[in-house]
Amino acid sequence: MFRHLFATVFLLFSFVNADFMFSYDNKNEYIEPMSVNASLSATTYLYTYSQSGHHFSGPAYDGSYIDTYGCCSGQSGSCRNNPSCQCQVSVGPLPQGTYSLGNMMTFKGMQYSYELYPASSNNMCGRSGFLIHGGACSGNPSEGCIVIENESTRYKIKSGATLKVVS
């Protein structure tokens, strides 16, 4: 009984304080607070975004799983979601590589947005300033940022997590 109560208290606390988290595999396991640049193990909050697949996936902070298609990155036209255009500034998708997610914020009125911090090993092609944010992929909402239209999906993304961008 005490163990269940202990886990429930920590679970409720994790919704209030985003700096604390549980591993996806074991919700009773406490993980130390993380900074934005903290490295994460492969079993802890690893998201994947496929440029050409328009697909974002990974474990949500609440224990559910995010598996959403229809995301976009890059300006509309032949370069949107096109890996061969990733080095075209303000046109192509977010360059492939590994990123750390910043804290949840509001960007241009869109709640549940996250800054993306590239790993030093990424080839950024002289590009910077990427985010995950909302908007309608039917327009031109992105110069390379990842656009996830559904607000409740963005809300479930864990700040401080790692994102792997693949072709």
Name what the model sees in each region.
Residues 9-17:
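Hydrophobic h-region of N-terminal signal peptides that target proteins for export
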Residues 1-4:
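Positively charged n-region of N-terminal signal peptides that target proteins for export
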Residues 24-98, 104-105, 135, 140-141:
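Secreted/periplasmic proteins
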Residues 17-24:
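Sec-dependent signal peptide cleavage junction
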Residues 88, 92-98, 102-167:
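Exported/periplasmic cell-wall-interacting domains
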